[in-house]
Design a protein with these regions (language model features):
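Short, acidic, small-residue-rich periplasmic hinge/interaction motif at the N-terminus
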Residues: 25, 38, 50-54, 87-89, ...
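Surface-exposed extracellular loop regions of Gram-negative outer-membrane beta-barrel proteins
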Residues: 227, 231-245, 313-319, 330, 402, 511-513, 542-588, 608-636, ...
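N-terminal periplasmic accessory domains that precede
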Residues: 108-111, 153-154, 195-198, 212, ...
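Short acidic/polar hinge/loop motifs at secondary-structure boundaries
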Residues: 76, 153, 159, 186-214
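Transmembrane beta-barrel wall of Gram-negative outer-membrane proteins
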Residues: 253-281, 297-345, 373-375, 534
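Outer membrane beta-barrel strand-and-loop segments of large Gram-negative receptors
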Residues: 418, 427-431, 472-477, 482, ...
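Short, acidic Ser/Thr/Gly-rich low-complexity loop/linker segments typical of extracellular
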Residues: 56-72
């Protein structure tokens, strides 16, 4: 009995001791370990690197922490014997084994080496890989391009392979200006009445990335024979509050500021961007013409023109995304944009004889004021049925744009004039997309899109007579234009081992109404078209693949090209639309190749496009002459610019991009595009055949310097080009920028110099049977901009996997 009681007592004491031991362990005084972790190559601190400590006696009790923005860590632990691991995604980990730590200890400084294999699987937020390749598009991330800081969207476009921007800001893709520009995957009021001109008002800092789609799938609208450029705006998805404030100042006179705010909880994400810009832009050019007078000597007219433009605008975007549950979300957003612009154009016109003697001289001053406003409301409902991409997305978008333009025109030899243009546009967009991944390697989708727009143009000219302005009814008109497009699409894609394909078909029904109120001309056009798409890909390895794409596209005439009422820009020249203009259709084949080596990446493609009923602008004589001088008598043929359909255009080209990265401190990339364009067709017994070989190239270098400095230099050359009646010369542009991190990397100072050589001139020669014209034009002179950026709660080193969906409304095709 005593032995039993003794045994029970020992067991009880033992259990009590072991039961109390953890509590006693917890009461032991903690100590600290500290140190610093940096990148071995750049010496930059690694924020959010992890430090984990495993006690040999208690392996399930893991202690640890993370580094701060300076790469420092300071962690409280219990004394003991530990295996310590220091890790950062994309770098080789460091392990310290069997370290006995009994007191506060400084572990020291650790320099982690890059792990090239794991780095290929992740990417830095704000510093992602410059180019991503998808089955049907290329994605260019903007974050690292410091030469566009303080600039606009057009400056970003001017540095993207295959994209070029002319001196007037017009955007073309592979030399074709019929490119469709989308914002977050949808048409936008930012690309409304003013076209690409409105993009100059959107700051470069608001852009997350740009998608270049040369072989669009069936989900995309069929407009744009060159392809699609999709601009994705920034929207932070990180939990908590973060903000970015940007201030710009430059020469010529330029002041600007941007505030981007984002607040995210588990269920709600609120985001906003506010921008203000006040910019002065100087430009000008010369326009020299020779008019043929049959057997008589030619007459000449030389114009010298100077522009002084001031643009003041603000842009406010506000939105909220509410997560009803883990698989259902509702997003509501909207923006307003207001722009007040003035432009003074001073023109001196000299009429000369064949000997070069000035016969008469006219001074012309045109003072123009423009108010351009737009607003947009968007509501998006997304229902995810699972985590594999099975979803239903419904979206509605309402847009409204107005543009009021008034000009006072005074001539030294004729009465003054006033011209006013009132334009308004409404556009409603409805879209429904359903995506069903049948299994991990197979996907089916279909959808509907309704695009309904109406536009009213009121153009009025008044001429001063006896001190009063009298409306000239021969030059004033009102045009109503409506365009309604209903579309259905479906596509099916699959991946079989290393082979992927995406097959699609899109149907679009178009109804256009042209109502010229002044002349009571009414015309209605209806047509239905089918647009097949094919995208194929074969992956030899993770470093090498090929793609093949086919798409059929359409180019619909714009309202101004259909308006039959003449619009005069001078006494001898006017523009007139063609209401019989038909849409143009194109079929494009695109073959792509991608190869990655350790330090070199090659991305190339070859393409062929055949377009029919090509919309072409021509200048022709009206058969009338205009007397521009009485003493001596000088008569000049009256000319008209209009648009016509020619038979066809064939475009064959190739492009490639090489990126060389010998180290993380230096990157060199180059892009080259060359194409042959052949236009065939006749109009009014006149042959408009033309063929040209043109090319453009760009080179870009990025250097990381010590103490937080970075530098970038880029050059762009656009080769000669030609149309049915004109030829343009090539030009070269050199720009550069430097960048310095300040305030513990919370702030950045950037200095950007654009067109360092003052060489961006557009030189063009137009030749017809009646005249030849040479023009040399500069849209804007060199500019220099200083930008300061300050960020609050930015987690720039946090990483995410490649291929994560950004919710941009685009068409990511992945299996």
């Amino acid at each position: 009995m005593k032995r039993l009681l003794l045994t029970l007592l020992l067991v009880s004491i033992t259990c009590t001791v072991f039961a109390q031991r953890p509590n006693n362990y917890q009461n032991i005084t903690k100590i600290k370990i500290s140190g610093n972790i940096t990148d071995s190559e750049t010496a930059e601190p690694l924020e959010y690197a992890t430090i984990s400590l495993v006690n040999e006696r208690f392996p399930n009790r893991i202690q640890g922490g993370i580094t701060d923005e300076n790469g420092n860590f300071d962690i409280e632990i219990f004394p003991g014997k530990y295996n310590i691991t220091l890790e950062y995604i994309g770098f080789q980990k460091v392990t310290l084994e069997n370290r006995i730590i009994r007191e506060t200890t400084l572990l020291g400084d650790f320099k982690l080496n890059i792990n090239s294999e794991s780095l290929n699987e992740v990417e830095l937020i704000g510093e992602r890989t410059e180019v991503e390749i998808r089955l049907d598009k290329r994605i260019y991330n903007v974050g690292k391009d410091i030469t566009v800081r303080g600039g606009s969207v057009t400056d970003v476009m001017d540095n993207i392979p295959a994209v070029s921007v002319d001196v007037e800001g017009n955007i073309s893709l592979r030399g074709n200006d019929n490119v469709r520009i989308l914002i977050n995957g949808k048409p936008s009021g930012l690309v409304g009445l003013s076209g690409s001109a409105a993009l100059r008002q959107l700051p470069a800092e608001s852009i997350e990335k740009v998608e270049v789609v040369t072989s669009p799938s069936a989900r995309y609208e069929a407009s744009g024979t060159a392809g699609i450029i999709n601009i994705i705006l920034k929207k932070d998805e990180l939990i908590g509050f973060n903000a970015t404030f940007i201030a710009n100042a430059g020469i010529p006179e330029y002041l600007g500021g941007t505030a981007t705010l984002n607040w995210r909880t588990k269920r709600l994400n609120i985001f906003s961007t506010t921008t203000y810009r006040d910019q002065k832009s100087l430009g000008g050019g010369v326009f020299n013409s020779e008019y043929f007078n049959g057997d008589l000597p030619s007459s000449f007219a030389n114009e010298t023109r100077d522009y002084d433009r001031i643009r003041k605008n603000y842009f406010v975007n506000l939105g909220a995304e509410y997560y009803i549950n883990d698989k259902t979300s509702l997003t509501i957003s909207g923006f307003i944009r207001d722009s007040n612009n003035t432009s003074d154009a001073n023109t001196e016109i000299d009429d000369l004889n064949a000997n070069g003697d000035v016969l008469s001289s006219v001074d012309r001053l045109q003072e123009e004021a423009e108010e351009d406003n737009s607003s947009q409301f968007t509501a998006n409902f997304t229902k995810k049925f699972n985590d594999d991409g099975h979803e239903l997305v419904a979206e509605i978008q309402l847009q409204k744009s107005t543009e009021d333009e008034f000009a006072d025109i005074s001539n030294s030899d004729s009465p003054s004039e006033t011209a006013g243009t009132l334009e308004s546009q409404k556009r409603n967009l409805f879209q429904l997309d359903y995506v069903w991944p049948i299994d991990k390697n197979t996907q089916f989708e279909f959808g509907y899109r309704g695009d309904f727009s109406s536009q009213e143009n009121d153009y009025e000219i008044a001429i001063k007579e006896n001190g009063r302005f009298i409306i000239d009814s021969n030059l004033s008109n009102v045009l109503l234009f409506e365009q309604n497009i209903n579309a259905l699409y479906t596509q099916f894609g699959a991946k079989i081992n290393k082979f992927s394909y995406l097959l699609g078909l899109r149907m679009e029904n178009t109804n256009i109404v042209i109502d010229q109120k002044t002349t009571n001309d009414f015309k209605e056009k209806k047509y239905t078209n089918f647009f097949p798409t094919v995208n194929l890909s074969y992956e030899f390895s993770e470093e090498e693949n090929i793609t093949l794409g086919f798409s059929r596209r359409i180019r619909r005439p714009r309202s101004w090209s259909l308006n039959p009422f003449p619009s005069r820009s001078s006494v001898t020249f006017f523009r007139q639309g063609n209401p019989d203009l038909d849409p143009s259709y194109s079929s494009t084949f695109d073959f792509g190749y991608l190869k990655r080596w350790e330090k070199l990446t090659l991305n190339g493609s070859a393409y062929y496009q055949k377009a029919t009923q090509v919309i072409t602008r021509i200048t022709e004589a009206t058969g009338e002459v205009v007397r521009v001088s009485e003493d001596p008598i000088i008569e000049i043929p009256s000319l008209r610019a209009t648009s016509i359909n020619l038979a066809e255009n064939n475009r064959l080209g190739t492009e490639f991009t090489l990126t060389f990265t010998p180290s993380r401190k230096f990157r060199l990339s180059g892009n080259f595009n060359i194409f042959n364009s052949e236009t065939i067709g006749t109009y009014n017994n006149q042959v408009f055949d033309a063929e040209i070989v043109s090319w453009f190239a760009r080179i870009n270098s990025n250097v990381t310097l010590p103490k937080g400095w970075t530098a970038q230099l880029r050059g762009f050359y656009r080769g000669p080009n030609a149309t049915a009646q004109s030829k343009s010369k090539g030009f070269f542009v050199l720009s550069g920028a430097i960048n310095k991190d300040v305030l513990n990397k919370k702030g950045t100072l950037s200095f950007n110099a654009s067109d360092l050589l003052n060489s961006r001139f557009y030189r063009n020669t137009t030749t017809t049977k009646l005249f030849t014209n040479y023009s040399e034009f500069q849209w804007r002179r060199p500019s220099y901009v200083m930008t300061f950026t300050y960020k609050i709660n930015e987690r720039k080193n946090q990483r995410r996997k490649r291929g994560q969906n950004y919710g941009d409304g685009g068409d990511d095709v992945e299996f």
